[in-house]
């Protein structure tokens, strides 16, 4: 595998560094963004929450002046001093009285420290809070020293006039002699809940006129300006609100020196300039206009006026002496200024801003260095404060990155030297120390032996490697690259330093010169210490553990190396024993006899050569390790036999461990490695196919490598699927145990509920710089941050920094539909997040209602990502969808009417034969569709049920009105195509067209009633429904659909029964065919029920002709009665007798027609089915008659 670079990807470690440095010292601090208005709080630690009693969601996005901690006893000049430090971007420490959430007070030292980015621009503020004990208060008689005098100069005021407000007055007094830092300002009535600040209007010429120069004499005194108006406590504080003037005796003690003046109404205040750039903005010329120092945040606080004789050398001072010396900053009332640069060319006016505003200063003015005192107080170490940016690890000079190319090449070189040491050290110790030729070479000097020179070079290389290891970075447990030399040295001392040091000592060089046997043996033993360098190889083995071929090759090399070592030992045993053996039975003597090179005691050079000895020894060890040997080289002495036994034992273990696992190694070669390379190949193919650009390509590859290192290629979902569900729940509960225990919302849940929640949680790993949620994304999940830190940005402005145990998303129980994100969420470091889908969470809460209330009450989002207008917009969208749905229905019906009128106009010229043919085809279609009417009923929405029932009920009456006159169609103004409408139970468009044809005269009848429209509005616009309410409404809707289906089934059965009774048909009145004499028209009966649905009014006689006015009146009345049935109204029943008499007359006249004409029509009867009709009376309800209606009397 390549060198792991995932650990060293650029990441923002700002939050982690601050927490690590502060939490260990039990600090209580907040972090504020200096580039936004009010310097909003974007992070607070747990110590601050415990100190104040406020939770983190309560503190986030509040101004860093901590207005919510202010109360009646909070000094205004202390608050103003904090505002001064924030405006000037300078470090300062102020003692302030704050209030707990429960209303109790505590005194706290507030320490403001600016944090800069790589350009030296202060991007954030760290505000640290320290308790002040009673002993410290007693030891400090005065927190602020009196003001030193300043020279009297012709100085003019910066006047801010508020003509609509009541202000305080002051009296002209003499000006002190020394105070070069003072800027005198007239302010309005103080805000009672914030350091910041009312809208300041641009000063006028009168406010900066020379006539006000003498007014400054009364302003600068050791005393404070006495408040002469009642100022209420902070609006947002939880403690009882009292009058501030009762709690400010120190502000009333100087009333004798500062009295009222009736001629002027203003309040004096003193502001200390924060930097030299502030003073550069002031000019002597009265026409100088000040430009807003922060171009992106114009807030309308432009100040102008003369200002001179100010010592810039004393400005921006942050030492304790200067803070105490120039103590007039404690006298500032609750207001904020935005000093601007001088610009004489033109005048820039900015729109007014909000009340609470602290304007971020200009970039170049935020270059104050953090003083040594700040570093001592915070104990931050050498790096003082981290920089808020995506940064690669800071590398000190002469420090080598552990993943650099040089280090990789050096490691391979050292590995080769280790292999050389492992091979030649045993060989030199066993074969060369007692060799006569080697002894002669040593006599001429250490450099005569080439092997000694190589050993010396190797020793030097290892010593250099030790020095390099002292300057090589490493990755700690937090996956951070450590480059501090001191930390590297400590880490190396605790690790491999001792082994490397012993292996690098050149022992043979240290004891060179003594030729005794004891020295020779000692040198041989000490040289074996170099074999400890092989431990370096173990450091690299895990990198190649995924490559089966590399592991197999490595094991084979280990096997050969062990055989080499054993061969050296085998020779050493025989060489040591040979002089003491009298019978010469050792394996060396046997070897000399076999190859014809016998030993001669008188000749030291006799016997086998070194090559023969080494090859024979190596042959013996290999044969013994792999088998029991062949016997040509055999042990003869006891020592040799014991060693042979040990070799056989080692051989059996080596053979079983190496060669027995060859198959497993090969399988791993095609398992883990195959998975890694296959996944990597997929990534590369994806990059190639989609032509991913290089920056994004590098991110993909680095994330894949890091994720593989992080999970070792294990898919947790696949692993969990192999276990039973109960075991999966236990595993998930263990994996999410920290989250479920630390989050307050999950406390008190039952074990079953926790198991269900754990099963729904998914773990997400995000690299630094990755955007988890984009602005505008649908919030489908709730996120819990378990490791790392993230930032939330709105328009590329950091609004919050979240760390461990923070929660972000939306309150899922408050909205029926998921909202959209209002910000981007981006990872600063490697993050682990637990997320649960919205539907899964609601499902669990629905299953455990007793836990639901507790969860929804205690769930506190650190940052709510839901857009502000999402809720109202969802309601408007639902209402708009309802209107669109209705418009689509109306337009669809109108199109159907147009097509229907066209068909009717085309059918006006059809003869009776075509009419009969269309009727027969329509009957077949009706028979085919009637069986499917139930499915149509079940698909109709509950809101459309009254409309549908009215339509079905009105259809038979329209057919009857048409057939009473033997007409197929009505006149052009209101005709209906009967053969297409009589059987259209399944087509809702046709069903609506039945109702809309006569509705042209009465448009209000086409739409549902007001009650129905109200029901539609409730069901379609009410979006804030819970899951249980939706289930209940669906159940009610299903019950209503079932009842409707049963009613329709009964209606269809009645229709089929009526169709079966009809055996004869009668031709219409205009037909030339006459009915037979035997035919007698049946009399129509009108069956009256207890609740009559409708009645038809008829006041005129009728003519069978379509041109007769009486006929048209009857048809009109019929259609009106149909519409009344559709809308559910009740009509009079007085006309039923009239209709019955008319029908009897019609039946008498029909006897003169030809019987053949009776067969031309056979119209099906539609049974009315109203919503309130019961099953018992549905069979006899309404008007029943046979189909044939040849005409009326008088034809």
Swiss-Prot record:
Keyword Transmembrane helix attributed: yes
Catalytic activity: K(+)(in) = K(+)(out)
Keyword Transmembrane helix belongs to the record: yes
Record-level Gene Ontology MF annotations: heme binding; inward rectifier potassium channel activity
Residue ranges constituting the PAC domain according to the UniProt record: 92-144
Extent of Basic and acidic residues compositional bias: 890-902
Residue span of region Disordered: 194-216, 870-915
Coiled-coil stretches: 1027-1054
Residue numbers on the Cytoplasmic membrane side: 1-412, 471-494, 543-549, 663-1195
Gene Ontology CC: monoatomic ion channel complex; plasma membrane
Main localization (coarse): membrane
Annotated intramembrane regions: 615-635
Entry keyword set: Cell membrane, Coiled coil, Glycoprotein, Ion channel, Ion transport, Membrane, Phosphoprotein, Potassium, Potassium channel, Potassium transport, Transmembrane, Transmembrane helix, Transport, Voltage-gated channel
UniProt free text on domains: The S4-S5 linker acts as a signal integrator where it both couples voltage-sensor domain (VSD) movement to pore opening and closure, as well as providing a binding site for other domains that regulate activation and/or deactivation of the channel.
Role according to the record: Pore-forming (alpha) subunit of voltage-gated inwardly rectifying potassium channel. Exhibits faster activation and deactivation kinetics and slow inactivation at membrane potentials positive to 240 mV, resulting in the weakest inward rectification.
Protein name as it appears in the record: Voltage-gated inwardly rectifying potassium channel KCNH7
């Amino acid at each position: 595998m390549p060198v792991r670079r995932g650990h060293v990807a650029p990441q923002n470690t700002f939050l982690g560094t601050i927490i690590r440095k502060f939490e260990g010292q039990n600090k209580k601090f907040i972090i504020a963004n200096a580039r936004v208005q009010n310097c909003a709080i974007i992070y607070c630690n747990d110590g601050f929450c415990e100190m104040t009693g406020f939770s983190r969601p309560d503190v986030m996005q509040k101004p860093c002046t901590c207005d919510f901690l202010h109360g009646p006893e909070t000094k205004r000049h202390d608050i103003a001093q904090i505002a001064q430090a924030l405006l000037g971007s300078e470090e300062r420490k102020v003692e302030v009285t704050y209030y707990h959430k429960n209303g109790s007070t505590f005194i706290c030292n507030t320490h403001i420290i600016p944090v800069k980015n790589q350009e030296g621009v202060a991007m954030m503020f760290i505000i640290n809070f320290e308790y002040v004990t009673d002993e410290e208060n007693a030891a400090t008689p005065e927190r602020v020293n009196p003001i030193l005098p300043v020279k009297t100069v012709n100085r003019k005021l910066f006047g801010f006039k508020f003509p609509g407000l009541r202000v305080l007055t002051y009296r002209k007094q003499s000006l002190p002699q020394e105070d070069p830092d003072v800027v005198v300002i007239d302010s309005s009535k103080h805000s009672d809940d914030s350091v910041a600040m009312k809208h300041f209007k641009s000063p006028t010429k009168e406010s900066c006129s020379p006539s006000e120069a003498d007014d400054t004499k009364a302003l600068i005194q050791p005393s404070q300006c006495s408040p002469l108006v009642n100022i209420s406590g902070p609006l947002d504080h939880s403690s009882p609100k009292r009058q501030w003037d009762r709690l400010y005796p120190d502000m009333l003690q100087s009333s004798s020196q500062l009295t009222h003046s009736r001629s002027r109404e203003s309040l004096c205040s003193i502001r200390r300039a924060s930097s030299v750039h502030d003073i550069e903005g002031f000019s002597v010329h009265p026409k100088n206009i000040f430009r807003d120092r922060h171009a992106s945040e114009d807030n309308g606080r432009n100040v102008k006026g003369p200002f001179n004789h100010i010592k810039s050398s004393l400005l921006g001072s942050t030492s304790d002496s200067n803070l105490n010396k120039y103590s007039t900053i404690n006298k500032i009332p609750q207001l904020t200024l935005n000093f601007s640069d001088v610009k004489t060319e033109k005048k820039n006016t900015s729109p007014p801003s909000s009340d609470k505003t602290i304007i971020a200063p200009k970039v170049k003015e935020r270059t104050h260095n953090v003083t040594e005192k700040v570093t001592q107080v915070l104990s931050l170490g050498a790096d003082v404060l981290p920089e808020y940016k995506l940064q690669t690890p800071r590398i000190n000079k002469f420090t080598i990155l552990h993943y650099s190319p040089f280090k990789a090449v050096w490691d391979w070189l050292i590995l080769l030297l280790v292999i050389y040491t492992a091979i030649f050290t045993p060989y030199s110790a066993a074969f060369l120390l007692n060799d006569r030729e080697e002894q002669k070479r040593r006599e001429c000097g250490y450099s005569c032996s080439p092997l000694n020179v190589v050993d010396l070079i190797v020793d030097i290389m290892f010593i250099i490697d030790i020095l390099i290891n002292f300057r090589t970075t490493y990755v700690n447990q937090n996956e951070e690259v450590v480059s501090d030399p001191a930390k590297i040295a400590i880490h190396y001392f605790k690790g491999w330093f001792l082994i490397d040091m012993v292996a690098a000592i050149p022992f043979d060089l240290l004891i060179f010169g003594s030729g005794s046997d004891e020295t020779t043996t000692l040198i041989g033993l000490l040289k074996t210490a170099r074999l400890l360098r092989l431990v370096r190889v173990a450091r690299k083995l895990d990198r190649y553990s995924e490559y089966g071929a590399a592991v197999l090759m490595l094991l084979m090399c280990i096997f050969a190396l062990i055989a080499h070592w054993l061969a050296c030992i085998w020779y050493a045993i025989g060489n040591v024993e040979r002089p003491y053996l009298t019978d010469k039975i050792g394996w060396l003597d046997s070897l000399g006899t076999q190859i014809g090179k016998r030993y001669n005691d008188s000749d030291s050079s006799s016997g086998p050569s070194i090559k023969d000895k080494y090859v024979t020894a190596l042959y013996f060890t290999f044969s013994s390790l792999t088998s029991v040997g062949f016997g040509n080289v055999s042990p003869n002495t006891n020592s040799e036999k014991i060693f042979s036994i040990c070799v056989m034992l080692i051989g059996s273990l080596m053979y079983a461990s190496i060669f027995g696992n060859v198959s497993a190694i090969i399988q791993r070669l095609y398992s883990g490695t195959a998975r890694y390379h296959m996944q990597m190949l997929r990534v590369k193919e994806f990059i190639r196919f989609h032509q991913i650009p290089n920056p994004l390509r590098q991110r993909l590859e680095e994330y894949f490598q890091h994720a593989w290192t992080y999970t070792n290629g294990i898919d947790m979902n696949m692993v969990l699927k192999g276990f039973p569900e109960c075991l999966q729940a236990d595993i998930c509960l263990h994996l999410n145990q920290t989250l479920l225990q630390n989050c307050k919302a999950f406390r008190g849940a039952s074990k079953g509920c926790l198991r269900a929640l754990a099963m729904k949680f998914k773990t997400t790993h995000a690299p630094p710089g990755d955007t988890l949620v984009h602005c505008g994304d649908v919030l489908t999940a709730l996120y819990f941050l378990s490791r790392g830190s993230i930032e939330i940005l709105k328009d590329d402005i950091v609004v919050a920094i979240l760390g461990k145990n923070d929660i972000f998303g939306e309150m899922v129980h408050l909205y029926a539909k998921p909202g959209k994100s209002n910000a981007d969420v981006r990872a600063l470091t490697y993050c682990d997040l637990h997320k649960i889908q919205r539907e899964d969470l609601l499902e669990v809460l629905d299953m455990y209602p007793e836990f639901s209330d507790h969860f929804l009450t205690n769930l506190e989002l650190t940052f709510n990502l839901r857009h502000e207008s999402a809720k109202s917009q969802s309601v408007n969208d639902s209402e708009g969808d309802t209107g669109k749905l209705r418009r689509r229905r109306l337009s669809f019906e109108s199109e159907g009417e147009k097509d229907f009128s066209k068909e009717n106009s085309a059918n006006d010229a059809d003869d009776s034969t075509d009419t009969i043919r269309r009727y027969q085809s329509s009957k077949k279609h009706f028979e085919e569709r009637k069986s499917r009417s139930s499915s149509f009923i079940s698909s109709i929405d509950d809101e459309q049920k009254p409309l549908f029932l009215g339509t079905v009920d009105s259809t038979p009456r329209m057919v009857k009105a048409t057939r009473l006159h033997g007409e197929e169609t009505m006149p052009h103004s209101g005709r209906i195509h009967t053969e297409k409408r009589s059987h259209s139970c399944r087509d809702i468009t046709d069903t609506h067209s039945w109702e809309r044809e006569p509705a042209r005269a009465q448009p209000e009848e086409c739409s549902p009633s007001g009650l129905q429209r109200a029901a539609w509005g409730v069901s379609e616009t009410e979006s804030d429904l819970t899951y249980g309410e939706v289930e209940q409404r669906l159940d009610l809707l299903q019950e209503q659909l079932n009842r409707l289906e049963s009613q329709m089934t009964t209606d269809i059965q009645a229709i089929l029964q009526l169709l079966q009774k009809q055996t004869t048909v009668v031709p219409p009145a205009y037909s030339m065919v006459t009915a037979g004499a035997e035919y007698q028209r049946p009399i129509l009966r009108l069956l009256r029920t207890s609740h009559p649905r409708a009645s038809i009014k008829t006041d005129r006689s009728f003519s069978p002709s379509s041109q007769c006015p009486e006929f048209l009146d009857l048809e009109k009345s019929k259609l009106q009665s149909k519409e009344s049935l559709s809308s559910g109204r009740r009509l009079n029943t007085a006309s039923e007798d009239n209709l019955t008499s008319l029908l009897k007359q019609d039946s008498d006249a029909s006897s003169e027609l030809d019987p053949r004409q009776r067969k031309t029509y056979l119209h099906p009867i539609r049974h009315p089915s109203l919503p309130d009709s019961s099953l018992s009376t549905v069979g006899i309800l309404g008007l029943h008659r046979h189909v044939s209606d040849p005409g009326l009397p008088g034809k």
